[in-house]
């Protein structure tokens, strides 16, 4: 055992020296400026490159990632207005996580931020700082980088993402004093402050337990034992009802829906009628506008 531990330390040192360890994110960034006319589009290309490099070259924490372990994520900016200095629009943030012992990847975040506004000058450097708000753009990028990491770590170990929620909270605290849109508490139940609160407030942070049970004890287990893994997923969904009962407008509920609803249809496609009905009856009161998608759970049972 001692020899093995020494060899592990030597291996770790070799990884560090050879530069095998990498930053945490592998983020694909796209900027759509189709709504903007009469402007040199070069600035959007420059911005896209700058954000890509910022997201992928920043060290967001102290975790060590191998190059092939980087978290796959995407950021889609749709710019709806630009006055030469200030851009406004929305941002779709997505992240995925691999499922153990399979080639399947599962979505963790699929969230649309509809209140994105920032100033940017072409070739302006994006400067990272943990202790100050360099710009609203970098604050937005920092916030979502930390949330991507927080949810990813939560999905692998109970409350494993706490360090990144703390970092995201620091970003929100600094940004709230700036007067910029999208940060103020109670301003909007789907803004960045609300997103953070959904995962940290005592009344709704059960969503973090759901993340771990659903992914690590559910999906990861399904590859080897489908019935056992699915049973854990079914049990974990009860957290959604608990959140709904105390905070029916919590963004945690819509974030789970947007990331997981289609996946749940597939998970239960081969379930027995009783299990399908149980899941349907739990989810439908929470997501009544999603009846068409939810009905597919029951439709499969009639076609078996």
Feature names for model-found ranges:
Residues 23-88, 99-101:
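Start-of-domain marker
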Residues 34-41, 127-135, 245-246:
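Second-shell loop/turn segments in exported
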Residues 160-253:
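Flexible, glycine-rich surface segments
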Residues 52-60, 150-154, 265, 269:
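Sec-exported extracytoplasmic/periplasmic mature domains
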Residues 1-25:
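Bacterial Sec-dependent N-terminal signal peptides
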Residues 30, 218-304:
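A cross-kingdom marker for long, charged
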Residues 85-197:
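Acidic/His-rich structured neighborhood in mature extracellular/periplasmic domains
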């Amino acid at each position: 055992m001692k020899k093995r531990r020494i060899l592990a330390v030597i291996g770790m040192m070799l990884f560090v020296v050879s530069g095998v360890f990498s930053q945490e994110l592998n983020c694909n960034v796209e900027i759509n400026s189709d709504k903007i006319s009469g402007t040199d589009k070069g600035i959007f290309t420059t911005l896209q490159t700058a954000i890509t490099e910022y997201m992928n070259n920043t060290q967001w924490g102290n975790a060590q990632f191998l190059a092939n372990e980087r978290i796959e994520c995407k950021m889609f900016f749709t710019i709806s207005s630009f006055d030469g200095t200030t851009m406004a629009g929305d941002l779709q943030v997505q992240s995925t996580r691999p499922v153990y012992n399979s080639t399947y990847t599962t979505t963790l975040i699929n969230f649309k931020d509809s209140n994105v506004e920032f100033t940017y000058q072409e070739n302006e450097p994006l400067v990272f700082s943990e202790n100050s708000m360099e710009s609203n753009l970098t604050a937005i990028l920092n916030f979502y980088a930390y949330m991507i990491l927080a949810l990813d770590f939560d999905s692998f170990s109970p409350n494993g993402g706490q360090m990144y929620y703390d970092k995201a909270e620091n970003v929100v605290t600094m940004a709230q004093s700036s007067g910029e849109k999208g940060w103020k508490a109670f301003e909007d139940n789907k803004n960045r402050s609300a997103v953070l609160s959904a995962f940290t407030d005592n009344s709704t942070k059960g969503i973090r337990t759901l993340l771990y049970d659903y992914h690590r004890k559910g999906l990861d287990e399904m590859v080897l034992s489908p019935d056992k893994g699915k049973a854990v997923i079914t049990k974990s969904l009860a957290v959604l009802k608990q959140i709904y009962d105390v905070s029916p407008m919590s963004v945690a509920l819509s974030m789970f829906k947007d990331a997981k609803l289609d996946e749940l249809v597939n998970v239960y496609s081969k379930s027995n009628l009783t299990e399908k009905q149980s899941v349907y009856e739990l989810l439908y009161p929470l997501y009544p506008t999603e009846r068409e998608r939810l009905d597919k759970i029951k439709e499969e049972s009639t076609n078996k």
